[in-house]
């Protein structure tokens, strides 16, 4: 199983728009072959160090059956459209961690 943590910095005032964009494709993504989990998350006030609340970060937590399934996910037409639409909402890019269990 492959785990993905993808964090995106959105422009101030665009977080809700970005969340709606992600929600608009979530049903399609979860139906993709090999998708185990596709969860949209945002920061909360936890009071736990070292977390710093950032209202402009959106984090996807994903699980895929294999690296091949993840790679296929990135080539599907609805993802190409998603990446195109998100350009106007994102600032500073994103970070991606692709992990496997130790």
Stretch-by-stretch model annotation:
Residues 1-2, 102:
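Absolute protein N-terminus
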Residues 2-9, 39-74:
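Short, well-ordered beta-strand segments in beta-rich or mixed alpha/beta enzyme
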Residues 14-40, 78-83:
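Short amphipathic alpha-helical segments
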Residues 24-27, 56-61, 77-82, 92, ...:
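Short, low-complexity, polar/charged sequence segments that are solvent-exposed and flexible
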Residues 39-54, 82-102:
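Glycine-rich beta-strand-turn "strand-cap" elements at beta-sheet edges
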Residues 67-91:
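C-terminal structural segments of small proteins and small subunits
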């Amino acid at each position: 199983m492959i785990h993905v943590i993808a964090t995106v910095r959105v422009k101030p005032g665009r977080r809700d728009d970005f969340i709606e964009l992600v929600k608009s494709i979530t049903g399609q993504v979860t139906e993709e072959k090999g998708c185990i989990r596709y969860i949209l998350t945002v920061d909360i006030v936890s009071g736990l160090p070292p977390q710093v609340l950032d209202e402009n970060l959106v984090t996807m937590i994903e699980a895929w059956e294999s690296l091949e399934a993840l790679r296929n996910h990135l080539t599907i037409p609805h993802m190409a459209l998603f990446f195109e639409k998100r350009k106007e909402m994102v600032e500073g890019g994103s970070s991606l961690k692709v992990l496997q269990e130790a």
